[in-house]
């Protein structure tokens, strides 16, 4: 799986992974992180998620990273926002109303790009990557987050043999292996009845897991 896979999905309109509402678990659990107003929050593999709008409405400065220029342009167009634009070594930047989106590769971000991110919201990134890429992703992104960062990580847990991802199954054991003491399980919910597309593809069990991520300051 490479960048072209996701670029093709956006070009072909195969974006069933996009939600046309704010993820319900976000307003439920995000306040428990107690991030200060104005804190910069990283949203990796952001797509055109409305979760970014919600985070900005809470007073955060949102930094989203997304490969597809189509997704980025649709995000601002659908919000009716006219973004400022500029270019850097990380990619093309678009910014308006507290949301900055970098159209570029998350693996090109370095500690200079992430040093001001006190928070991270990962709903669609870790589960979008195959197992062979998840360790590299976690090391690259979370390994460069500043000391004392706090994050909310949402994953899915289902029998991977019953369905090809994405989204992929990332269970509690793998999250603990990737993040160690930085990860704390807050919640586990059975959501199979709410996700008929999974059942239609033969999935017999589907849980969503909610983790708090934090690094010692």
From Swiss-Prot:
Entry keywords, A to Z: Cytoplasm, Methyltransferase, S-adenosyl-L-methionine, Transferase
EC number: 2.1.1.67
Positions contributing to S-adenosyl-L-methionine binding: 10, 45, 66, 123
Protein name: Thiopurine S-methyltransferase
Places the protein is found: Cytoplasm
Lineage: Bacteria, Pseudomonadati, Pseudomonadota, Betaproteobacteria, Burkholderiales
Entries under Pfam families matching the protein: TPMT
Alphabetized PANTHER family for the sequence: THIOPURINE S-METHYLTRANSFERASE (PTHR10259:SF11)
């Amino acid at each position: 799986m490479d960048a072209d896979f996701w670029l093709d999905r956006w070009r072909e309109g195969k974006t069933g992974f996009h939600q046309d509402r704010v993820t319900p678990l976000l307003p439920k659990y995000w306040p428990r992180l107690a991030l200060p107003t104005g804190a910069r929050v990283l949203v990796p593999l952001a797509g055109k998620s409305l979760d970014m709008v919600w985070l900005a409405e809470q007073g955060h400065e949102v930094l989203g990273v997304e490969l597809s220029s189509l997704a980025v342009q649709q995000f601002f167009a659908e919000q009716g926002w006219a973004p400022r634009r500029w270019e850097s070594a990380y990619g093309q930047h678009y910014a308006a109303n507290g949301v900055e989106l970098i159209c570029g590769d998350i693996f090109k971000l370095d500690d200079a790009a992430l040093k001001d991110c006190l928070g991270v919201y990962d709903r669609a990134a870790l589960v979008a990557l195959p197992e062979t890429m998840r360790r590299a992703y976690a090391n690259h992104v979370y390994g460069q987050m500043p000391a004392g960062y706090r994050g909310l990580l949402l994953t899915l847990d289902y029998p991977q043999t019953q369905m090809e991802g994405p989204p992929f199954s990332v269970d509690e054991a793998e999250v603990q292996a990737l993040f160690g003491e930085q990860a704390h399980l807050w919640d586990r919910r059975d959501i199979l009845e709410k996700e008929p597309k999974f059942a239609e593809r033969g999935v017999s069990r589907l849980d969503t897991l909610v983790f708090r991520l934090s690094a010692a300051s």
